[in-house]
Amino acid sequence: MDIQYLMRQAKKLEKAMADAKEKLAEIAVEAESGGGLVKVAMNGKCEITRLTVDPKAIDPNDKALLEDLVTAAVNAAVEKARTAADESMSKATGGIKIPGIAG
């Protein structure tokens, strides 16, 4: 096996992975909870880009409900972002599973 060839292929894979990681910020996912009372937008790096709370969800006497709605929406958005990031990184690596490279 040609070592030079393997080194070139490794460099190509490294560049493809770096490019894909940069593009994670461009991935956009949204999730909601409480029938749309709380909405979260997130990018592929699992950074929240927008959080919307319907005034109907704000009850000073039931703070726990709002906390639960926000938690549920954020967790759903994280799951969607991770899935999208994994798909993006899988394309960059040609389907090779490399632990810890997404996001």
UniProtKB/Swiss-Prot annotation:
<comment type="function">
    <text>Binds to DNA and alters its conformation. May be involved in regulation of gene expression, nucleoid organization and DNA protection.</text>
</comment>
<comment type="similarity">
    <text>Belongs to the YbaB/EbfC family.</text>
</comment>
<dbReference type="InterPro" id="IPR036894">
    <property type="entry name" value="YbaB-like_sf"/>
</dbReference>
<dbReference type="Pfam" id="PF02575">
    <property type="entry name" value="YbaB_DNA_bd"/>
</dbReference>
<comment type="subunit">
    <text>Homodimer.</text>
</comment>
<keyword id="KW-0963">Cytoplasm</keyword>
<protein>
    <recommendedName>
        <fullName>Nucleoid-associated protein AnaeK_3694</fullName>
    </recommendedName>
</protein>
<dbReference type="InterPro" id="IPR004401">
    <property type="entry name" value="YbaB/EbfC"/>
</dbReference>
<dbReference type="GO" id="GO:0043590">
    <property type="term" value="C:bacterial nucleoid"/>
</dbReference>
<dbReference type="GO" id="GO:0005829">
    <property type="term" value="C:cytosol"/>
</dbReference>
<keyword id="KW-0238">DNA-binding</keyword>
<dbReference type="GO" id="GO:0003677">
    <property type="term" value="F:DNA binding"/>
</dbReference>
